[in-house]
C-alpha cells in the first residue's frame, strides 16, 4: 500500500555517513522557507539569496548572480562552522501555526541508514533503513489544510559518492515509489535495483533530475580493492625494511665500509627504517579502513612519528650533500672530517626533527583537531603558522640547499673533467741532445696516458717509493700507497703541486741531481699513470659515492670507498683492483724490507690486458736495457746516450707512513734507475719495485777508440728512435678517445646528480605543496585519494634512499652480494684505493 507524504519545511538537513568508518559529511540542508499560502512573510534579502541559487546539470551548486553565497552561507546566514556545530543538536522542526509535529528530517534519517546499509550490506542495517523510511512515510499531514510547498535544497559536496544516493532516496520517498509494508528489506533491495536509473525530485511545478549513484559496492569489488591495497602497501613496507637493513648490516659487517662518511649513510638508513616500521604500518591501516579507527591518542603518536622520521630522513640528505660539497671544495676538510664532527651533524639532524615533530604536542594545534578525530580523520596540525614552519624546515629550505650544493658539485666535476687534457711534459733536455729527444718525450708521455688504469702496488706499512731531485730543478716521481690519505685536489688534476712529497710523510733523503738526465723507466711511467689515475678519481668522488677521504693510522679511520667507486664511474672499462704488495728498498733509506701480504696475482692486481699495449711496454723496457748497456762503456761525459726522462711533480698527497726514496743521477756512470722486479715471471709489470744502483751488464764488446764512440752513440740513438717510432701510431687515437671519455664522464656525473635530486623532488614535492595549500586555502578541496597518493609517494622516498645512496658504490654492491650469498672477506683483506 502506497502512502503519500509531503516534506514542506520538514527537511532540516541531510547528514550522511561514510559506510566504512562513519565519517560524516554535510550533504544538503534547506534554505529559508519559501512563502506559504497563509501569507507568512520572509526576509527579502533571504528570498533574493534563494533566487540566486541554482543547481547545475552535474549537481553542483551555482550562484547565478556571482554573489559567492555558496561559499559564505549555508542556513539562515550562518557560516559553515557554526552551522555544522549545531547540526547534532538541532531538534525536529515543528509547525508554528499548528500543534502537529511534522516529520522530523525523514530524508536525513533514511539517508544515514541507507549509507550504513551500503557498507556492510547487512540485513540489520537494511531493516533499520526500511523502518526509518516507513515511519517517515506514515507521518501524514492534511494536504487540504496545509498545502505542500517544496523545500529549497542547497546541495553541498555533490562530488561525494553518497550525495546522489541520499537525494535519490529522498526522491523515492517524495514520489511515493516504494512499498514498505511487511518487508523491512524492500527499501534496500529497491535502491539496488534502481541504482542506475533517474528519479524526479519534484520541486513545485518544475523538476530536478538527479542520477542515483551506486548505493553499495559489490562484496567482490570491495574485497578486491582492500586486497590490492594491502598487497601493494605491504610490499612497499617490506622492501623498505629489507633495503635499509642491508645498508646497516653492510656497514657493520664490512670493515672497509666503516668510515666516517658512511656514518651519515647509516643514520639515514636508520631514519628510513623507522619510517618503514613505525609510520607505514599505521598508515596502511588508515588507508585500508578508509578512516582512523584507532583513537586520538594513537593518532597523536602516529603523526609525531611521521613528522619525526620523515624530517630526519630529509635532513640526512642535506647533511650528506654538505659533506660531499666540503670534500670537493675544501682541501683541508679531509683532515677535519673526524668522527666527532660527523656525529655532531647527525645529532643536529635528529634534534631538529624532534623539535618539528613535538611542537603540536605542546599546544601548537588548530581548534578543529579533535573534531577531525571524531570524523575519523587523523592529520597533522592544520594550524597555518605551524604548517608554514614545519614545511619550510622539513622540505622547502632543505630542497634549496640540496639543489645549490649539488649544482656546485656538478660544476666542479665538470671543470675538472675538461681540465684533464694532455699537457706537454717538462723535459730535462740537455743542450747536446738531438732534436729527436722531444719526439721521444712526447711518445712516452702519450704512453703514460694509456697507463691510466694501471693500479700501483702498496705495502703493508704504506711505504711510498719516490724518485725526486732537488726543488730547484728536479722532479719528484712516486708510487703512492693505495692506503695513503687522499686529499681532494683543488688545482688542475694534470698539474701537480710544485713541491715534493709532504715533509710529514717523507722519510727519505734527496740526493742532489746532476746535469745528467734521468732515465725514463717503466716505473716512472707507472708512477705518472698512478698520479693520473688519482686525479681522475678525484674529479667526481663526491658525485657517485661518498666523498673521498683517507685513512690515518693514528685515529683508526678506515679508507673510504669513494675513490674506488669513482674510478669505475670515470673509466669505461673499469675493474675492481685489489691491493698489491710492495717491498721498497733503497741505498739512501733505512726503511727496511716489508713482507708482502699476498701474491699480486692472488690479490687481483690489474695488469694491462691490451696485447698491443703490453708489446709497447716491453719495447720500452728493452729500450731501457739498451740505454743501460750503452752507459756502461767508458767514462763518457756526454749525455747524448740517455733518453729524455719524463719529469713530473709529485702531488701533495700526505701518506700515512710514506717513505720517499730519493733517486737522482749521481753521474753518467752511476745513474740510478728504477725497475719493477716481477713476482710473476709471466708478466713484467706484476712485482715489487726495487730501487738499486744500476751497474754495467757484463757483455763482450770490442774496445772502441775515442773516434768511434760518437758514431756508436749516434747509431744507438738512431736504433732507439726507430723502436719508439713504432709506438707513435697507436697513440694518435689517445686524444680522440680521451675527449669521448670526458663527454661520457660529464654525462654520467650529471645523470648521477639528477637521480639523487630528482628522486627527492619527485617524491616529496607534491605532498608538501598539498600540505601548505590545505591550511592556507580553506576553499581548496583535495580528494582523499589524491592526498593518500601524495603521502605514500613521500614514504616511497625511504624505499629509494638505500638504493640511490649505495648503488653507485661497488663496495656496497659487493657487500650486498656477500650478505645474500654467504660469502666472506679474508681476514687479511684491506681495501685498496684507485
Swiss-Prot record:
Residues 551-564 have a biased composition (Basic and acidic residues). InterPro entries: GPCR_Rhodpsn, GPCR_Rhodpsn_7TM. Disulfide bonds join 299-378. CDD domains: 7tmA_5-HT1A_invertebrates (cd15331). Residues 582-593, 702-723 have a biased composition (Low complexity). GO terms for biological process: adenylate cyclase-inhibiting serotonin receptor signaling pathway; anesthesia-resistant memory; chemical synaptic transmission; G protein-coupled receptor signaling pathway, coupled to cyclic nucleotide second messenger; inter-male aggressive behavior; male courtship behavior; phospholipase C-activating serotonin receptor signaling pathway; regulation of circadian sleep/wake cycle, sleep. Keywords: Cell membrane, Disulfide bond, G-protein coupled receptor, Glycoprotein, Membrane, Receptor, Transducer, Transmembrane, Transmembrane helix. Residues 254-263, 323-341, 414-752, 809-834 are cytoplasmic. Residues 56-75, 420-442, 460-516, 531-599, 617-640, 674-743 are annotated as: Disordered. The chain crosses the membrane at residues 231-253, 264-285, 301-322, 342-364, 392-413, 753-776, 786-808. Changing residue 91 to Q: In strain: CA-030, CA-068, CA-091, NC-008, NC-025, NC-043, NC-048, NC-060, NC-075, NC-088, NC-091, NC-114, NC-116 and NC-135. Pfam families: 7tm_1 (PF00001). Changing residue 49 to V: In strain: NC-036 and NC-123. This is 5-hydroxytryptamine receptor 2A. It comes from Drosophila melanogaster.
